[in-house]
Amino acid sequence: MEPHDSSHVDSEFRYTLFPIVYSIIFVLGVIANGYVLWVFARLYPSKKFNEIKIFMVNLTMADMLFLITLPLWIVYYQNGGNWIFPKFLCNLAGCLFFINTYCSVAFLGVITYNRFQAVTRPIKTAQANTRKRGISLSLVIWVAIVGAASYFFILDSTNTVPNSAGSGNITRCFEHYEKGSVPVLIIHIFIVFSFFLVFLIILFCNLV
């Protein structure tokens, strides 16, 4: 078999695999995250939320933002990689994926640091106004990441390619990238910096 034939098989295989995997993730994710939000809403009045609970609720909300886009991707791959929805939904799906990824990383980082503070400085942590700090830090995280993700709304997210399985053309979503774009370079630098910053925080808190 020729090399290009192998890549074609791999490409076709994802149209079967991804809808199945995404469907499982969607069902389990909605149930699990919905249950977490229900528990917090029922058992903990909002005024009694401490810092760690605030971070956990925000982490759950970030996951839910990603989950609501999965039906779009399921339909996309079921249609052989053809985006049948309006273009702005492709931009929105990419934006929410970015937000989920980096909000999750950020909130896992601050949760780790919160536990580090609780273990190393229990008295000072207990006396601090952690609820106010948790709300403020959560707002900073959301504003920073949503601001960076807003770039996805101005991207040319879709492109038209010939349909390899038949006649006509199909529309791809985020499957082509412009080269030499300064904004793309900036966003990639932000991604790498953010990841390693949080990674170092988590590593430090677990090793010290």
UniProtKB/Swiss-Prot annotation:
Any one GO MF term held by the record is: G protein-coupled purinergic nucleotide receptor activity
**Topological region Extracellular:** 1-16, 75-91, 156-184
Q: Which SUPFAM superfamilies match?
A: Family A G protein-coupled receptor-like
Record membrane topology: Multi-pass membrane protein
Cross-referenced InterPro entries: GPCR_Rhodpsn, GPCR_Rhodpsn_7TM, PAF_rcpt
In this protein, the residues bearing a glycan are: 169
Function description:
Receptor for platelet activating factor, a chemotactic phospholipid mediator that possesses potent inflammatory, smooth-muscle contractile and hypotensive activity. Seems to mediate its action via a G protein that activates a phosphatidylinositol-calcium second messenger system.
Q: What is this protein called?
A: Platelet-activating factor receptor
Origin species: Macaca mulatta (Rhesus macaque)
